């Protein structure tokens, strides 16, 4: 969301939640390794901008 602070300046705020699931596999030497990976990061950003 962009919020006007004055005629030329604004603040932008963004919040996102992601849900990711994946399977990983590989070898650790001769031994096979497998993993199930679940990520759910909350990503936030705040920006200050100037319009001209």
From Swiss-Prot:
- Pfam families on file: OmpW
Gene3D superfamilies per the UniProt record, alphabetical: 2.40.160.20
A GO cellular component annotated for this chain's UniProt record is: outer membrane
Keywords attached to this entry: Aromatic hydrocarbons catabolism, Plasmid
The cross-references to InterPro entries, in alphabetical order and at most eight, read: OMPW
Q: Does the keyword Cytoplasm apply?
A: no
Tell me, which GO biological process terms does this entry list?
Answer: catabolic process
Pathway of action: Aromatic compound metabolism; naphthalene degradation
> Keyword Oxidoreductase on this protein?
no
Task: Write out the coiled-coil annotation as residue ranges.
Answer: none
Q: What is the role of this chain?
A: May be involved in the conversion of 2-hydroxy-4-(2'-oxo-3,5-cyclohexadienyl)-buta-2,4-dienoate to cis-O-hydroxybenzylidenepyruvate. DoxH and DoxJ encode different enzymes that may have interchangeable functions.
The identity of this protein, by name, is Dibenzothiophene metabolism operon protein NahQ/DoxH
Organism this protein belongs to: Pseudomonas putida
What gene name is given for the protein in this entry? nahQ
């Amino acid at each position: 969301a962009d919020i006007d602070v004055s005629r030329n300046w604004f603040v932008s705020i963004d919040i996102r939640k992601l849900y990711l699931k994946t399977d990983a596999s590989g070898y650790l030497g001769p031994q096979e390794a497998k993993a199930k990976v679940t990520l759910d990061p909350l990503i936030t950003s705040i920006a200050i901008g100037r319009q001209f």
